[in-house]
Amino acid sequence: MTGGVGKEELRRFYSEDFVPRMPPDTKLTPVSRTIGTDQLVDEMIFSFTHTEEMPWMLPGIKPTNRAVKIPLVAIVHFRDGKLAHEHIYWDQASVLKQIGLLSDPALPVVGAEAAAKVSQTI
């Protein structure tokens, strides 16, 4: 999980870790969106080639140039009409498997197959 709570954490997250650290081929494919009076929940497929460091998702991991495709959920909460916090969730084991850092076949990690299953609902 990543994101931020409060003005300063959100500013830092968006300006330093998140937006400027996306690989150029990043693609977000919407699956579903739920909108409430003070909250937004987005379910999506997040795909990219790991061509640069991504401190928000893979802190300290050098680029592997491998393709990654995962389901991702973002929950955004608003307070008084302003962004209060954003939490982003994904299956880190699937990411690690796809970039080659987790390869034990005995582990119950599905990798890109999870994104393919979620994509069936689109």
Where are these regions (language model features)?
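C-terminal and inter-domain tail/linker signature
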Residues: M1-I122
